[in-house]
């Protein structure tokens, strides 16, 4: 390959593009709220009501191809969670998935929540993924934590506990 046929890199940290296909005229491309935003806002393509204490799938009318070596994580938008008790569930977009992206919303409030066409309902965060070979072993190397599970490391800073001793 000669220098004439190489694709120019305009930035040192230039990443491969996120490819989006609109499935209808109501679809909107994901957008970032600021230059340093980690996620891309995902938009509803039609009105959907999420029942009180219930769940619902919100259509986006987009499909995508995430860059090689990444997956897409559908994450909550902080404003929806803080103001309306709306959370996002089950949101992994694998590199080989090409179907419509839908957003599973949980309504933890006592009133129905209406998602309007064009509302930002979640954010898409692209994360690098490492998929090593699975190897079964007879024993694992010991660690300081050991098998301690939920709550085993405590909730405080540990400073008070150290001062008591």
UniProtKB/Swiss-Prot annotation:
GO terms of molecular function: dUTP diphosphatase activity; magnesium ion binding
Binding residues annotated for substrate, in chain numbering: 77-79, 91-94, 102, 145, 150-151
Family named by the database record: Belongs to the dUTPase family.
InterPro entries: dUTPase, dUTPase-like, dUTPase-like_sf, dUTPase_trimeric
Cofactor(s) the protein requires to work: Mg(2+)
Entry protein name: Deoxyuridine 5'-triphosphate nucleotidohydrolase
Transmembrane region(s): none
Lineage, opening ranks: Eukaryota, Fungi, Dikarya, Ascomycota, Pezizomycotina
SUPFAM superfamilies xrefs: dUTPase-like
NCBIfam families in the record: dut, PRK00601.1
UniProt enzyme class: hydrolase
Keywords assigned by UniProt, alphabetized: Hydrolase, Magnesium, Metal-binding, Nucleotide metabolism
Function: This enzyme is involved in nucleotide metabolism: it produces dUMP, the immediate precursor of thymidine nucleotides and it decreases the intracellular concentration of dUTP so that uracil cannot be incorporated into DNA.
Known catalytic reactions: dUTP + H2O = dUMP + diphosphate + H(+)
Organism in which the protein naturally occurs: Neurospora crassa (strain ATCC 24698 / 74-OR23-1A / CBS 708.71 / DSM 1257 / FGSC 987)
Assembly: Homotrimer.
Pathway, per record: Pyrimidine metabolism; dUMP biosynthesis; dUMP from dCTP (dUTP route): step 2/2
E.C. numbers: 3.6.1.23
Annotated signal sequence range: none
Protein's gene: dut-1
